[in-house]
Amino acid sequence: MHLEVTEKHVNMESYKPAIDLLFDEVSQIFWIVLFFYVIVSMIWIMYCCYINKMELSLVEKKIEENGVARSKELQRLLDAYNKITAENPTAPNPQSSSIIIPEQV
């Protein structure tokens, strides 16, 4: 009889209440979800940094292309102006009021 009581006592100690079992299950799922959340967050941050770097390189490339195009256009206009003044060197310079400035249009 004494042996049965001690076995029941030992068995009762090995059982956990339902709330503790639920807490253990939830905490185990929480750590798994947290681990994957951290991994996915790090991947997302690296992806955003990569995209930002690519966009910056595209912008720098466009700035360089626009600078080259602008300098070519300015050189073309300067050559056209020099050609006009070289053809008729005795003609007076045009008055500044006859020149149309793009901001005035």
Swiss-Prot record:
Biased-composition ranges for Polar residues? 86-99
- Compartment annotation: Membrane
Q: Where is this region: Disordered?
A: 86-105
Name the GO cellular-component terms: membrane
UniProt main location, coarse: membrane
Q: Which residues cross the membrane?
A: 29-49
Keywords, sorted A to Z: Membrane, Transmembrane, Transmembrane helix
This protein's membrane topology, according to the annotation, is:
Single-pass membrane protein
On the tree of life, the source organism's domain of life is Eukaryota
Query: What name does this protein carry?
Result: Uncharacterized protein F59B10.6
Protein source organism? Caenorhabditis elegans
